[in-house]
Amino acid sequence: MNSLRILIVDDSPAMRAYVRRTVQLASLPVKNVFEAGNGVEALEIVRKENREPNKLDLIFADLNMPVMNGEEFVQKLREDERDANVPVLIISTDATQKRVTRLRELGAQGYISKPCQPEMIRLKVQQLLGEEPSLSRREL
């Protein structure tokens, strides 16, 4: 796995710090971590940072944020073909099956319920980026 460029989108600074720390402690080769407090800020970062030769490798996004929520963010992100292939992992407390299905239809690749364990984040990242998880490959 190459050095990763990751974007964390959450209105909670504490949650952004938690995800950042978890990714770093998971022994993943992180090169850059960008942070945004809502979907509008995230799109600005994506439009600036997700360009050749330094594309983003993964986006973590919350659902319930001010200005632009996570669902709107994923939808807007997928409208630009240059950003259509960046994996998006949703981390949120809003875990209804209907909502998860809608997010997958919009283009999110995974979902983790808050509060989330560091091991769950690591396993999901490995799955999304094509690494063989060290635990079972059950659907998370």
Regions found by a protein language model. Name each.
Residues 35-58:
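Acidic, metal-coordinating helix/loop segments flanking the phosphotransfer/catalytic sites
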Residues 13-34:
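Two-component/phosphorelay signaling modules centered on CheY-like receiver
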Residues 116-125:
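C-terminal output helix
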Residues 65:
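Receiver (REC) domain active-site loop signature in two-component systems and cognate sites
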Residues 11, 114:
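A Lys-centered signature of the CheY-like receiver
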Residues 62, 92:
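Active-site residues of response regulator receiver
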